[in-house]
Amino acid sequence: MAITPTALHDALTQAAEALRSQRIEGLFDTTPDRTSGYRCEAAGLTLDYSKHLLHDSARQTLLTVSDTQALPAAFASLIGGEIVNTSEHRPALHTLLRGTASDQHPEKSKEIEETLSRMAALVESIHSGASTGDTDKRFTDVVNLGIGGSDLGPRLVCEALHTHAAPLKAHFVANIDPDDLDGTLAPLNPETTLFVICSKSLSTEETLSNAERAIGWLQAGGIQGQALGAHLIAVTTQVAKAERWHIPPERCFPLWDWVGGRYSLWSAIGLSIALSLGWQSFQRLLDGAHSLDMHTESASPTHNMPMVMALLELWQTHYLGANTHVVLPYAQKLAHLPDFLQQLTMESNGKRVSPTGELLEHDTAPVLWGSAGTIGQHSYYQLLHQGTRSFSADIILPLRSGEGDRDARRALAAHALAQSRAPMVGRPAEQARQLGVERGFDESASQQFEMPGNHSHSLLIMDAVTPESLGALIAAYEHKTYFLAVLLGINPFDQWGVELGKVIAGHMQTVLSGDDSNVEMDAATLAAAEAWRAANAD
């Protein structure tokens, strides 16, 4: 385990072992101020972690870890621009995109301000009708072409903050499967459709393929040559490559190597957000994230929301044995949050070696999954309540949910709070026996109604889903991910594991096209390739 000194690790191990025989609800009896004491508040968010299997002594030991592992200093290194991405010898300054520690980076801050100014001007020009398509019709739809960080973040934000009065309707295409693009474009009009092509190198296979096919769709709709540029925006470092699609330099926006893809929605990657929701909403999103940055920089470990979130995951994963973490947002607006967090956490912390190449002896990131409530209640909550797997969870509840049927929103909140209680209390054996007898089962068969409970989870309350609170929520998870990486002794800013599949896919292209029948590959894969070739022989 990366935790030092060893005595601290041993103390946590012993505390976890002692707590296994205790009930979470019993801790409320022994800790009178538990409800108010086990919470953090920041930027419109409240983290209530009182329903974790954790007592004061164990919590204090965990908080000591934040000092011994120098988490505050690690955050100062992050926002200060030190080389935290050691394998690629780069800083990770996504916080600078929202104005955090801008005084420490005057040159980079100037570049960001210039880019934001250009973005705002283009958005205003399109919304006002000054910039139109080739036939002088105003744009009605914007299609974001990207994958990974250039898709998941903007998609989450646009879905969460969408209103029927949005200036442009946003669409997202990431999959190389042509059904994704074709299905998206089917109801759209080429004359009123704008594309944002997001690729740092303009060589990402999925994005390049979709961009070429999208341009073909525009051409089939009568938009040719230089006129294509009116319908295209590129977020890339490769301006010369963009020009071959007739995208003028003023419609190309930069990406910097000190911003990783999964942290990039705050950059020009967020153009689809601004185009769909308006520049003010995008700026408010940045402001919310900045507020959370300021909280993270200044709050003590006891009250530091992302720091506590990271320590809780360390506690659950490494000391209480939780091997998955489920995120359950009780807001349809946040349905894409688990997808976004999967990339953020598992691509960042799904590592097995240290930055110096040492094989780690401890687990790193847990598997993260989830969906919007109450959908999950009718699919996998059965496993959560009565399965054999150990897990931890975040239940997310906005207090104010906007317009709509008040009774339905009350019911949604009731389900959220019920699922915040049920995993903790469960259904004891005696209650299960009584229920079984009432339903005509004998005592032995009545065990199927028992639910052990005692599952730890956090309740994360949002005042409402607004640009500010959503920006803060995303930033909180970003910083949690970074702090956990520091605790685990790994680099969260590279992703070498993504490359192997890409390399093999390149070989498979030659096999599937019939250009290389002598490639060395296992028989099962070659048999599947031959089946595909036979099915697509025409």
How would you name each of these model-derived features?
Residues 1-73, 307-319, 334, 341-342, ...:
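Flexible, glycine-rich loop/tail regions that form catalytic "lids" or insertion modules at the edges
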Residues 3-8, 15-28, 32-135, 140, ...:
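Extended, charge-enriched "interface" segments that sit outside catalytic cores
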Residues 7, 33, 53, 57, ...:
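Conserved active-site and cofactor/substrate-binding residues in soluble primary-metabolism enzymes
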Residues 121-129, 135-299, 507:
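Glycine-rich phosphate-binding loops that contact phosphosugars or nucleotide phosphates
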Residues 140-146, 195-201, 324-331, 367-368, ...:
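Short glycine-rich or small-residue beta-strand-to-loop segments that form or flank ligand, phosphate
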Residues 219-405, 426, 502-509, 515-538:
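Active-site phosphate/pyrophosphate-binding segments
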Residues 363, 367-464:
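Helicase-primase coupling helices
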Residues 452-455, 462-488, 493, 500, ...:
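C-terminal accessory domains/tails appended to large, multi-domain proteins
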